[in-house]
């Protein structure tokens, strides 16, 4: 598992999200971004630097944690969905697109300097992921969530 380092404000591309169309799972959302000059584009965004448990799986333990991660992300994005807060996406890639054609981004609500990506890991809803082999250690996520008092068993 590699270190997760979000891009600095100076070394990245910033996109302002005008609409959150759908939260697909804990690490993928569909949004509309403002390109400027009254131009908008719908994008599928892969939350960079994290991997969440899958919600579409036969593994009941993983499914439960995947549904929790999706609900957590929806809850955090609720203000941006309602238009109360602004969601911005930062990416270091030119064009920002990863190998599956999705925008790879770090999600920020309002003026926060802490990304939702980092919060997901800190609060036990995701693992850090650098593109290598995925580590699915469900018990570690459960332990972190127990310490935050957010795990319902």
Positions of PLM-derived features:
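Small beta-barrel nucleic-acid-binding modules, primarily SNase/OB-fold domains
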Residues: 1-153
